[in-house]
């Protein structure tokens, strides 16, 4: 059976809280969101996990998360170093911000050599999402065929402020494009987005969005590197300290030049995350409810 890897983008994990040890648990047993993702991934069939982290957080990450997971997974680490860039590109003076999700994933080249799924560390995706992506990858032999788990926008927003989501265009179950909207606000059963804080545009609650749960072949890592230089050269002309190389940028380019296709795997799960401190109570309530329903045991892994 082919090895299918779970890649977790965790370089920014804990930054809002002053460190990993300051992340508040979401249940009385002390679990944080990534614990549930790892548990769901294990149940789906994943046995290899790669954590993308900052080099300086490795010891704390191993202590808080990595060492515990070595009982269940083969664990590897990838560093998202600011200066790991294509030849000819240099870090602008004063730049401290990471280069974005596309760069994070590109750093896995040489470590991930087969099919893999990728997730954010601080999003709660739900059990079925991992089963769907694992089953797709297990059955797929064409390296140009990717997948994305698609959520309904109404299941991924918060009452407490804006969220960033990849708004998807879909035809016959296949992704035709994804647009990053960085300021989406809940509005009743629907939502609206703004680019400038003044003009707002409606989005239907049933709109399918990406939560960065993708299934790829290792070929995408070559694509990410091949396209990064041109993107950053152009982006740094106008925004050298803050521009980001987002993963959907490369997916869109591959869709446009027909070097890849992306099947959308619909998911009716509700997303949970602590985008805002006020979100914590609803996440805790949801976890308690799922435990009461038997979806999770009180103590994971027992």
Model-found features: residue ranges?
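Short, surface-exposed amphipathic charged segments that create phosphate/polyanion-binding patches used
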Residues: 87-98, 161-166, 278-282
């Amino acid at each position: 059976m082919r090895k299918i890897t779970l890649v977790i983008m965790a370089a920014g994990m804990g930054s809002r809280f002053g460190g990993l040890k300051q992340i508040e648990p979401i249940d009385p047993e002390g679990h944080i969101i990534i614990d549930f993702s790892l548990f769901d991934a294990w149940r789906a069939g994943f046995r290899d996990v790669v954590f993308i982290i900052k080099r300086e957080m490795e010891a704390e990450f191993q202590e808080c998360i990595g060492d515990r997971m070595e009982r269940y997974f083969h664990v590897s680490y990838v560093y998202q170093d600011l200066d790991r860039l294509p030849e000819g590109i240099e870090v602008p003076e004063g730049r401290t911000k990471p280069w974005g999700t596309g760069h994070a994933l590109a750093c896995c080249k040489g470590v991930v050599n087969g099919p893999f799924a990728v997730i954010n560390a601080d999003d709660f995706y739900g059990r079925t999402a991992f089963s769907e992506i694992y089953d797709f990858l297990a059955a797929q032999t064409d390296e140009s065929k990717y997948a994305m788990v698609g959520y309904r926008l109404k299941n991924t927003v918060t009452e407490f402020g804006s969220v960033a989501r990849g708004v998807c265009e879909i035809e016959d179950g296949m992704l035709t494009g994804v647009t990053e909207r960085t300021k989406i606000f809940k509005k009743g059963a629907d939502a609206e987005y703004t680019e400038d804080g003044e003009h707002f545009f409606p989005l239907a609650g049933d709109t399918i969005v990406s939560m960065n749960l993708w299934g790829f072949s290792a070929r995408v890592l070559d694509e990410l590197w091949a396209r990064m230089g041109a993107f950053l050269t152009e982006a740094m002309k106008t925004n050298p300290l803050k521009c980001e190389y987002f993963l959907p940028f490369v997916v869109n380019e591959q869709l446009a030049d027909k070097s890849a296709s992306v099947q959308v795997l619909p998911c009716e799960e509700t997303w949970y995350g602590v985008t805002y401190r006020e979100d914590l109570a609803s996440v805790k309530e949801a976890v308690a409810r799922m435990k009461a329903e038997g979806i999770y045991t009180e103590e994971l892994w027992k």
